Every structure is written in C-alpha cells, then in structure tokens.
From Swiss-Prot:
Record InterPro entries: Phos_transporter
Localization per record: Cell membrane
Record keyword rRNA-binding present: no
A GO biological-process term: phosphate ion transmembrane transport
GO CC annotation, single: plasma membrane
Name of this protein: Probable low-affinity inorganic phosphate transporter
Reactions the enzyme catalyzes: phosphate(in) + H(+)(in) = phosphate(out) + H(+)(out)
Membrane topology: Multi-pass membrane protein
Protein family according to the UniProt entry: Belongs to the inorganic phosphate transporter (PiT) (TC 2.A.20) family. Pit subfamily.
Function as written in the Swiss-Prot or TrEMBL entry: Low-affinity inorganic phosphate transporter.
Organism domain of life: Bacteria
Length: 417
C-alpha cells in the first residue's frame, strides 16, 4: 500500500468519525425541546431522530459541493491537509460536547480545514469570498432570523390560544411537536451529513479517484456518511440536549413546537440554496426566540452569552487545531507522521470521554432541574451504586425498667420505707 492510499484511508475513517460526533453533538438541535416538554421519551426521541437523519442525508448534495469546492482551492488540497482539518473539527466538537455548549459542528469543520489550508499553502488557498458569503453571513442572518421567527411564532401561539384550558393546549402541542421535531431531524440530515460527504469528496479529488469537475459524490460516500451520522444521533448527545432543553429556557409544548417549526423552515431553505449553515445556531436561536416570545418566560442570558462566545471562537480555535495538526503531520512526514496524528486524535478523544464520566448525563437525568450549570446536582447520581448506601440508623434508646421514674432537676426524691 502506497503512502497516498494509506492517507486516503485515514482521511475517510476520520471523516466518518467526525460525522459520528456531528450526529451525537447535534441531536439536541431537533429533539431537546420535545424531550424537555415531555412530548417524547428521551430514547424514543433519539431513535426517531436517527432514522430521519439517515433519510435526510439522501435528499440533497448541494452543501457537499459547497464544502468541496466553494471554500478552498481544490487544486491545492492534499490528504494531509484534509486530515488536519478533520482533527480540528472533531476536537472542537468533543470539547464543546463535554462542556454542554451547543456550538456549530459546521463551523468547527470549516475552521479546521481553513486553518490547515493556511498552514499548508498560505492565505491564497482560501476562497475568502466563499467563506464570507456561504458561511459567515448565512450564520449571522440565520441565527437572528430563527430567533425572530421563534419569538413571533411563540407569541402568536399564546395569543391564539388565550382562554383555552392549558391542559388541552399542551396535549395538542405535544402531538404537534412530534411532527415538527421530525422535520428538524430530516432537515439536519439533509444539511449536516453533506458536509462530511464534501470532505471525503475533496479527499477523493486530491487522490485522483474522482475528477475535480465532478459535482456529485459517489454513492458509497453518501451511504457511509448517512449511516455514521444516524449512528451518532442514536447515541444521543445528552449533554447538549440538557443545555438546550433545560439550561436556556424552561420549555413548554407551545414554545417547543414554535421553535422546532422555525428551525426546520430556516434549515431546509438554506440547504436548498447550498449554504453551509449551522443547524446548531438556528436551533439555539429558535429556542431563545421561544423564550422571548412567551409572556413572563425566563431566559437564562448567562447561558446564552456563553453560547455566543463559543460561536465567535469556533472558527479561529478549530483553525488553530487544524493548523497545528497539519504542521505536526507534515513535519514528521510519511507513515510515522500520519500514524502519530491519528493516534493523538484518538488519545485526545479518549481523555475527553473519560473526563465526561465524572458526571455522566443520559436519558435518566437529562430532564433534571437546572441548578446553575450543566452538571450541578447530578454528581451524586454519578456515584457507583456501591457508594450509595443508605444511612445507618442510630441504635434505639434502652428501655427503662418497670416502676422507674426519671429524676427531675430541683426535686429531691426519697426512697420509700
């Protein structure tokens, strides 16, 4: 096996690993509000989302073409560069998942690839007009638009249902949430699975397996990316789901349906035009809008502020990881460089996963009350069962003998004659 084929295999495996992390990182985009409001049981929600993500991945390839051709010069791409960009995306996805921050997988991937490209060939390798017009501008506009649509939709829902019994409206909206959440999952598969298709497409162009003039990825690329994302989605990104469903706003069924409907509309529209949109930012904007639009709702602006900071630093920090990885792999070179880069990625992923086990979040505690941060109040539940022993009861007080009277202070007692 020659070095280039070896690198291609590593790139394909790493790309599918990124797709897997994208699946569990972004499950909350579709299902967080349905889980938080009780419309769907947690495990049922992620299973439904996995199936619809799988179907959605086959519906379009416009975004894949954007990733493959619209952001960097395909003629300057090497397999080392693509691998380094994927490492940047995976590491950022895992870090934000650990912290429960719903940041953009799309921007992590794009940032990693752009950073690796700059490290490899300089600024000339990046199509800056494409980055601005296809990534940055749509992200800002879509997040603001989703917030506005979510707020207006929520306000209209509560305005329309004034005077109707709350129990009746919530039951109806819970049913509606199943449909709207399904639509968001379908939209997520349509938009996000294509990004990994585009990366593998780019690697195949670099290797020479497909023409640089090709416009559609091979069928095996589409199928493998769809399956990887569906598998990741089925595991459920419980940490992200908790932040979106409980940390930002206390979601009620009418808010959940309004948020999901606005998310689906914006995501599907962007996928149709080939924009590499962040579904996370759209979903978060919609949830935030649902809090703003409901009279008297509480929005946790501190949590929202941390999310915005994460969004702002995603592109540059993922780019730094991508650039560092490219420099390391390229400096060592050959098989040792590729193997070392791959090994460091998996060691980093393992360390992050082990850290998350200190306070695990899953379907059993994802809806626990929010007590200030992601894991507050959950640490006790993370202890092994052997450590959760019930308290030992105090021994009972001794029973006094018959005819015994306890002495009273200040009273002199005499023995009977």
């Amino acid at each position: 096996m020659n070095l280039q084929l070896f690198l291609l295999l590593i790139v394909v495996v790493t790309a599918l690993a990124f797709d897997f992390t994208n699946g569990f990182h972004d499950t909350g985009n579709a299902m967080a509000t349905s889980i938080a409001s009780g419309a769907l049981a947690p495990r049922v929600a992620v299973a439904l989302s996995a199936v619809l993500n799988l179907i959605g991945a086959f519906l379009s390839t416009a975004v894949a073409a954007t990733i493959a051709k619209g952001l960097i010069d395909a003629n300057l791409v090497t397999l080392e560069l693509v691998f380094a960009g994927l490492v940047g995306g995976i590491v950022w996805n895992l870090l934000t998942w650990l912290l429960g921050i719903p940041s953009s997988s799309s921007h992590a991937l794009i940032g990693g690839i752009v950073g690796a490209t700059i490290a490899a060939v300089g600024l000339r390798g990046v199509i800056w007009s494409g980055v601005v017009s296809k990534v940055i501008v749509p992200a800002v506009v879509a997040a603001l638009l989703a917030t506005l649509v979510g707020a207006v939709g929520t306000w209209l829902v509560y305005r329309t249902t004034r005077g109707v019994a709350e129990k009746r409206t919530e039951r109806g909206f819970r049913r509606g949430q199943i449909g709207s959440a399904s639509l968001v999952s379908l939209a997520h598969g349509t938009n996000d699975a294509q990004k990994t298709m585009g990366v593998i497409f780019l690697a195949l162009m670099s290797y020479g397996a497909v023409s640089t003039t090709a416009s559609v990825p091979p069928l095996w690329v589409i199928v493998s990316c769809a399956v990887a994302m569906a598998a990741g989605t089925y595991l459920g990104g419980w940490r992200i789901i908790r932040t979106l469903g409980k940390g930002l706003v206390e979601i009620k069924p009418p808010q959940g349906m309004a948020a999901e409907s606005s998310s689906a509309a914006v995501i599907l529209l962007s996928a149709h035009f080939g924009y590499a949109l962040s579904t996370t930012q759209v979903a978060t904007g919609s949830v935030l809008g649902s809090g703003v639009g409901k009279p008297g709702a509480e929005v946790r602006w501190g949590v929202a502020g941390r999310m915005v900071v994460a969004w702002l630093v995603t592109l540059p920090l993922a780019g730094l990881v991508g650039a560092f990885t490219y420099g390391l792999v390229h400096f060592i070179g050959g098989y040792p460089g590729a193997i070392l880069g791959f090994a460091l990625l998996w060691l980093t992923a393992t360390a992050i996963w082990l850290r998350s086990r200190r306070a695990p979040i899953d379907h059993t505690n994802v809806n626990a009350d929010w007590e200030g941060n992601l894991t507050a109040g959950l640490e006790a539940g993370a202890q092994p069962l052997a450590d959760q022993r019930p308290p030992v009861p105090a021994p009972p007080a001794p029973t006094p003998p018959p005819n015994h009277r306890a002495p009273q202070f200040g009273v002199t007692t005499r023995n009977a004659p």
